[in-house]
């Protein structure tokens, strides 16, 4: 990016999936900037800041701004080739091909295929002239729900025992719902102006308090630079976007006795 007079946040997110396409889409919707993935241009009409950042200009692709991948997506929609984008950005063609596949996705494809490529219910709804709730209900009715995998910190050398999970649209779960009394805590998501580590401190203290009361604890967060995403802090960590869809998927799976939303700042509320 470029230095300027406007204060900007330095927060980050981390997303995990079975494929790059699934992961990058989850990462973008974790950012909490009003987008649900690699979005088309019209998704920014209501936000002048994002709209200005998305003005289509191939020469600007040389600069590694926070919106460059969205601009690359727009370039593919406008018919540019992988070779053309590579000459400007020098991004490895493999990644460019993956972004191109997202950009040119056929939304008439089966929902299962769209979900495997990381498309959210909101994205599918907007691109099929439907409603998010209708897409969600149809998906659940047809048993198209995510499975949850454990992060293998040992590269399959021996069995990993870390309670560190992510969702994907696969057939099998690596885990079962936690047994006993359990409470879910929604983390603060990415750090940004007005949303910092003070909220993460509150989430961690909530974990300690719940343990004293005899509850198992479940954390949902997508910020890799926080204490709340340390895998050994809680009984189970879901490294997922803190969005309605992703949180409700976890609630449907775990069926916790309660959910604490007041400790994570603006995001959970």
Regions found by a protein language model. Give the residues of each.
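ATP-dependent carboxylate/acyl-activation modules
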Residues: 1-269
């Amino acid at each position: 990016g470029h230095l300027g007079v406007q204060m900007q946040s330095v927060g980050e997110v981390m997303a995990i999936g079975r494929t790059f396409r699934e992961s990058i889409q989850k990462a973008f919707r974790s950012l909490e900037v009003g987008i649900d993935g690699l979005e088309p241009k019209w998704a920014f009409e209501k936000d002048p800041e994002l709209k200005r950042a998305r003005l289509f200009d191939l020469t600007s692709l040389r600069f590694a701004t926070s919106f460059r991948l969205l601009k690359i997506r727009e370039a593919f929609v406008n018919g540019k080739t992988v070779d053309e984008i590579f000459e400007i950005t020098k991004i490895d063609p493999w990644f460019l091909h993956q972004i191109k596949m997202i950009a040119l996705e056929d939304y008439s494809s089966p929902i299962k295929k769209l979900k495997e490529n990381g498309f959210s219910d909101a994205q599918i709804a907007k691109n099929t002239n439907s409603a998010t709730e209708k897409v969600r209900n149809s998906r659940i009715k047809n048993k198209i729900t995510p499975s949850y995998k454990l992060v293998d910190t040992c590269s399959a050398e021996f069995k990993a025992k870390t309670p560190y999970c992510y969702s994907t649209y696969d057939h099998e779960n690596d885990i079962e719902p936690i047994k006993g009394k359990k409470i879910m805590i929604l983390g603060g998501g990415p750090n940004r102006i007005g949303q910092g580590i003070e909220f993460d401190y509150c989430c961690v203290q909530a974990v300690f308090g719940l343990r004293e009361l005899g509850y198992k604890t479940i954390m949902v967060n997508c910020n890799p630079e926080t204490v709340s995403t340390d895998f050994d802090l809680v009984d189970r960590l879901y490294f997922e976007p803190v969005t309605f869809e992703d949180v409700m998927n976890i609630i449907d799976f775990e069926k916790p006795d309660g959910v604490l939303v007041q400790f994570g700042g603006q995001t959970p509320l």
